[in-house]
Regions:
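Acidic/His- and Gly-rich active-site-bordering loop/insert found
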Residues: 2-133
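Acidic/histidine-rich catalytic neighborhood of metal-dependent amide-processing enzymes
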Residues: 127-199
């Protein structure tokens, strides 16, 4: 079992920056690359009916483990959706994530050569992060937490449910979609086939 952080640090290394200049979906090839990686990981976790469409939509199902058929019928299928792409404004190529352990409240030097610093003077919310671990870049790229952190959390939850069959759950549906940053999120997702009662 990988930790959520390990998954996240891996996912951000995939360049999935979308572009609004493309006419097709996905708008960039890196999204399909990550889609295939995630599909393989879902299959390794034991998720069923894993599909990657030609448009880089990934779907899968973790079946209910509720033994009582009457009880199982009453539990809705829950869907979790996250997007593969990262923002168009800043590059997602060659992301170099770094973990700052136990943030002390001061400046975090992202890139000494370039003079990039993450400072609580510029980002006052950092004072709420004292003592926490931070994941940062070298300042030359975006990190891609939107939405690769969501993907990592979903994968972590699935991993936990598979590893802990004593935790009863209804059917869990998963979808990873391309091009949210350019307005396509669920545009080509077959909602009926996805089959979640709530997502």
């Amino acid at each position: 079992m990988y930790s959520t952080l390990e998954r996240f640090l891996n996912y951000v290394t995939y360049d999935t920056q979308s572009t609004d200049e493309a006419t097709g979906v996905p708008s960039t090839p890196g999204q399909m690359v990550l889609a295939k990686v995630l599909a393989k990981e879902l299959e390794q976790l034991g998720v069923r009916d894993v599909v990657v469409t030609e448009n880089a939509y990934v779907t899968g199902t973790l079946p209910s483990n509720i033994a009582d058929p009457e009880k199982r019928k009453k539990v809705p299928a829950i869907g979790f959706i996250a997007h593969l792409d990262t923002a168009t404004e800043v590059t997602g190529k060659n992301v170099k994530p770094r973990v700052v352990k136990g943030y002390d409240g001061g400046d975090v030097v992202l890139n000494e050569a370039e003079g990039y610093v993450l400072s609580p003077r510029d980002f006052p919310f950092l004072k709420d992060c004292v003592g926490m671990d931070l994941v940062v870049t070298d300042g030359n790229t975006l990190l891609g937490a939107d939405n690769k952190a969501g993907i990592a959390e979903i994968m972590g939850a699935l991993d936990y449910l598979v590893a802990h069959p004593e935790v009863e759950h209804g059917t869990v549906k998963v979808a990873f979609t391309p091009d949210e940053e350019v307005g396509h999120l669920a545009k080509l997702l077959d909602i009926e086939a996805f089959g979640a009662d709530f997502a």
